[in-house]
């Protein structure tokens, strides 16, 4: 019968590097990886903002990762540099053409490629859609999503609805997640098996009608064990 061994930081680093190599949108030669007690730091540089995001997403997919620090710098080649005005116009156009973002709800400002989104929307998925709409644009070096969520629906029994949603989610073990609510605010505590589950639990919390604040204190279990 196979047992379990604790994965070391060195092994986890090799797994993260392997996943970065496997991700075709990431230039692994320009990105470094440091690991301490399961916490991963990515450094180096990317040639565009979406490559930086893809590198972080790749690291989050690796089993055993419990936290990620993103220190990757974006260094744009001349071929995709754009003026702040061009970026702002393109970003506004992308948002206007989105079917999920209310027209006129989001304002865009750009400074040296750093793109800031502000405004109010009703749902978290709309806030997320605005960020996704601009992060792949040429010339963008970073995105700050300062959009606030102001639900129009009055909150019902958020805690009961959220616990039910977590329980029926095939990706999560709801027994390890504790939900606390105060008015429209949600606090998640407990443990999850990987970083992906941590983000999935937060996504489920944001989907509850009436929620405008989610504090995610879920911890990825460590040390992570791998079957021999």
Identify the function of each model-found stretch.
Residues 1-228:
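N-terminal targeting leaders
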């Amino acid at each position: 019968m196979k047992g379990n061994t604790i994965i070391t930081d060195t092994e986890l680093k090799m797994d993260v590097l392997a996943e970065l190599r496997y991700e075709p949108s990431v230039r692994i030669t320009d990105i470094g990886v440091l690991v301490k007690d399961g916490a991963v730091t990515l450094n180096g540089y990317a040639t565009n903002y979406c490559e930086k995001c893809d590198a972080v997403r790749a690291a989050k997919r690796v089993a055993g990762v419990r936290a990620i620090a993103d220190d990757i710098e974006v260094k744009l080649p001349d071929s995709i540099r754009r003026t702040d005005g061009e970026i702002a116009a393109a970003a506004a156009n992308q948002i206007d053409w989105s079917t999920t973002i209310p027209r006129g709800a989001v304002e865009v400002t750009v400074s040296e490629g750093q793109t800031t989104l502000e405004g109010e929307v009703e749902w978290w998925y709309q806030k997320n859609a605005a960020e996704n709409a601009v992060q792949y644009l040429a010339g963008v070096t970073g995105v700050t999503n300062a959009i606030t969520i102001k639900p129009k629906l009055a909150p019902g029994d958020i805690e009961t609805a959220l616990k039910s949603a977590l329980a029926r989610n095939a990706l999560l073990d709801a027994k390890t997640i504790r939900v606390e609510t105060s008015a429209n605010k949600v606090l998640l505590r407990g443990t999850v098996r990987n970083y992906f589950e941590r983000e999935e639990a937060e996504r489920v919390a944001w989907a509850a009608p009436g929620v405008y604040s989610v504090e995610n204190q879920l911890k990825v279990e460590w040390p992570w064990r791998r079957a021999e």
